């Protein structure tokens, strides 16, 4: 609706004033499309624009948002759900649901940031028995080895590598009490994220594990950073 357009323009104008970055992340995940099926205004817009379904309605809206951002000299990033109804080649896809959506986007010519939850969600538990060892939080276990398994270029042709802008580790804070807790969830697993980004073609987990256990505790200690000790104590 025109009211929705006015809202996003006002809100994004504030974002642009605050952040001078080239890229603006507009989200696009977890849209309530079941509600859109029951929404008379949504269904009217689908009919008026000749759209096939609610996925295309989201894409229709995203195209308008992206056009507005381009008019203001910025570029759009969105979660991989924005691909479901089709998206422009200029949009940057942040692939979180799984790596293969990012691979698909890169093959189609979109730029991609790989952040699949199975490898990059650092708020996930660091042990297989979180109720015993960790504060309340997500119970899915993400080991250092599993983080390190990520290959952002898997199943891509060399000519498509340029479409991978990089990788990102995420820490969602619903269950995070303070910044020290953020550090403990991020470190040392962020070291695996960093090595994948810098040396994906020279990965060797056994060598990485030896270096990490030898160097990181002192490094973090000297910097007065909090970190999880499970990896260093071989607690899984």
Protein language model regions, located:
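Alpha-helix termination/capping residues and helix-transition junctions
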Residues: 1, 17-18, 161
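Short, small-residue-biased leader/transition segments that mark boundaries at the very start
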Residues: 1-7
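Residue-level preference for long, well-ordered alpha-helices that form the structural scaffold
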Residues: 5, 50, 54, 58, ...
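Gly/Pro-rich turn-and-neighbor structural signature
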Residues: 6, 13, 17-104
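Short charge-dense sequence patches
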Residues: 9-22, 132-144
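Flexible, acidic glycine-rich loops studded with aromatic residues
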Residues: 75-81, 86-91, 96-236
């Amino acid at each position: 609706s025109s009211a929705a357009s006015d809202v996003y323009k006002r809100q994004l104008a504030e974002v642009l004033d605050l952040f001078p970055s080239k890229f603006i992340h507009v989200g696009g995940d977890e849209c309530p499309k079941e509600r859109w099926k029951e929404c008379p205004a949504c269904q009217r817009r689908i009919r008026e624009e000749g759209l096939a379904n609610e996925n295309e309605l989201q894409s229709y809206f995203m195209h308008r948002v992206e056009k507005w951002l381009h008019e203001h000299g910025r570029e759009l990033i969105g979660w991989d759900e924005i691909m479901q109804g089709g998206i422009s080649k200029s949009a940057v896809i942040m692939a979180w649901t799984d790596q293969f959506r990012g691979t698909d986007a890169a093959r189609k010519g979109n730029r991609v940031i790989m952040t699949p939850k199975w490898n990059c969600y650092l708020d996930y538990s660091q042990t297989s028995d979180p109720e015993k060892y960790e504060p309340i939080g997500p119970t899915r276990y993400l080991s250092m080895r599993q983080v390190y398994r990520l290959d952002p270029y898997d199943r891509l042709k060399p000519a498509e590598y340029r479409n991978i802008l990089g990788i990102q580790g995420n820490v969602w804070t619903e269950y995070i009490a303070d910044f020290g807790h953020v550090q403990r969830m991020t470190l040392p697993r962020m070291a695996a994220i960093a090595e994948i980004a810098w040396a994906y073609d020279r990965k060797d987990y056994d060598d990485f594990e030896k270096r990490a256990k030898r160097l990181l505790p002192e490094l973090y200690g000297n910097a007065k950073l909090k970190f999880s000790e499970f990896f260093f104590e071989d607690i899984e």
